[in-house]
Amino acid sequence: MKRDTEISNEVALIWNTANDVLRDIFQRTEYPDIIYPIVLIRRIEGVLIAKTEELKTQLAVQLAKVDAATQTNILNSKLLQEIKFNNISSYTMQKLADEGETSIKSNFISYLNGYTDNIKIIIDRSGIRNHINKLAEEKILFMLIKDFSQIDLSPQKVSNIKMGYVFEELVRKFSEANNAEAGEHYTPREVIDLMTHMLDMDEKAIKKGQLVTIYDPACGSGGMLSAAKEFIEEKINPDAKVVLYGQEVNDKTWAVAQADLLLKGETAYITKGDTLYEDGTAGEQFDFMLSNPPYGKSWKKIQKKVMAASNGRFDIGQPRSSDGQLLFTLHMISKMKPSEMGGSAIAIVHNGSPLFSGDAGGGESEIRKYIIENDWLETIVALPTELFYNTGIATYIWLLRNNKPEKRKGKIQLINAVDFWKPMKRSLGNKRRRIHNGIEGSGENERYVEANDQIKQIINIHKAFEEGPYSKIFDHEDFAFRKVSLDLEETDDNGFPVTILKEIAIASNKLLDIVPAKTTNDKKLLAELTNKKGKDDEYTFVLNPKSELALKHKTADRTITIRKTVIGNKLSFKATITIPKIVKDTEYIPWKANKETFLQKEIEKNWTITAEEKGYEIPFTKHFYIYQPLREQAIVVNEMAELEKENLDLMQQLGIKL
């Protein structure tokens, strides 16, 4: 892959600097807290210096006519107009290094404070100020600044796209070294490209000058947002007005996103905070949304705050507290524009859990039900494993849309793209595979080979919307099922009902229902039974077979003996009856199957339905399973005989006698 070699020099310089300067003074887990901000500051400075030199050339005649102070004012004013920031201190990282170690701490702080407020908030949230004292006390602040002043991260040397890759690779290496958890990773560029293509942006939808809004609720360093904007401007309409929105919970990652988008001159609004309980875009709706939220990550500690700030977003159902990824899906759904206003499209990456976790009536199933029955789920694409940097698990792109074309209404497409990959020339953490974009060679030999473009192949399968080896089309109800709770009557080996004795309490107001007392004798016994002045005793009656008790407990008894207990002036009644032995059972029945026929076929015993719920699950792999028949017995026997002969020959050659 071309970018693997393009970024290796910068990454190696930064990585080696971290190891050389910080080792034995900071814990390895602390390296990113220092290196990320310094990389960020060096990049910001590189953009500032490059723009300043450009302006000096453009304004050479004007600047030559004024003194140095006025020149500085003119340049600072121009910088604010063109790149929205400047630095009024007299320092750069090179000048800090040139002045030596004596005043490095105070000079560095002055340098940081010289930036405009929009950069200072990025620097503050990057966390570097928390480490300045220790860096200075350990005599390594000067070394760090000196080494980084020699690493050229200017736009002329490192393009915006390349800078994103540099940072991505640093995050991957630090995460790998620190055993970061599997869900927290960068999204590979080919996955982002596939997602943006699947959003189905086109010239008809995005007209010249039209405002297009794109949102990522877990935007990380902003890579998806930038890629989506690039896609619109390069492939669809360069004159579209694209506004980016995002939210990120991590201070340092937010700082990277904010800086990256600011340096690119993007119109972007990146809010800081936890999307689930600090909705930074409350009341907003967006045209396109894409995200790769954390999966397999517990939200138990924030559950109360999340539900308190739900504002209806999560009322439909809550997933298990051990995995909150579906909450991001619900959050994005809440940001969809109504279909009559053009609607919205969502592409989101999940692991396998949201496909099937949770029973009928549970949070995950209710969320799937909500999405499917509203006809928002358009497509799910199974991606190759070993595609992400810090995890090799199976992942899926869910495509949701509330403005489906007519042919897709009421339908869901599953695309099995697990085999659409090429091996990496060298592994990047857990990433050993990539979805090929058709670019072959590098440098002057770089060329596009359409036949090798696996992204395009997947997109074509999606657009074709046809059944095939990699594509299956389903109705909504193909993923629905009934969860039926049953009472089964146990039988013995001869098929006769197994009964047990059960003691039950009888309310006094139910006596006449249980005991009709039609005969004179029954009336007499009933009077004695209900006499509060009588003694503890028991009475046998003819049992009303249509009584609530008989029907509820399915007793076959013809009579019932009721025991009377007198406590003061109060009476209590109990009886022991013979009832069938009941076994609890649960059956899961496909929604399209006839319930009665299914139970009659599957259940031999007498059954009674006690509860029924509708659920949804998407057993993706089941629908693409290809049965491999067992080989003929004779072939297997012959192969075993041949192997045995080979073993005997080998043993004879070794001089082993049997």
Task: Give, region by region, the residue ranges found by the protein language model.
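Short, contiguous acidic/charged loop-to-helix segments that flank catalytic cores in large enzymes
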Residues: 25, 300-323, 352-362, 384-390, ...
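Conserved S-adenosyl-L-methionine
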Residues: 181-291, 295-307, 313, 326, ...
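Short glycine/proline-enriched turns and hinge-like loops at secondary-structure junctions
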Residues: 28, 208, 282-283, 391-393
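Non-catalytic, mostly N-terminal accessory regions of nucleic-acid modification and defense proteins
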Residues: 1-203, 269-280, 382-385, 409-416, ...
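Feature representing long, continuous alpha-helical segments
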Residues: 226, 255, 291-293, 326-330, ...
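Active-site catalytic pocket residues across diverse enzymes, especially alpha/beta-hydrolases
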Residues: 48, 232-236, 336
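Flexible, glycine-/basic-rich loop-and-beta segments that form/coincide
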Residues: 389-502, 506-509
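Conserved Class I SAM-dependent methyltransferase catalytic core
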Residues: 30-43, 195, 318-400
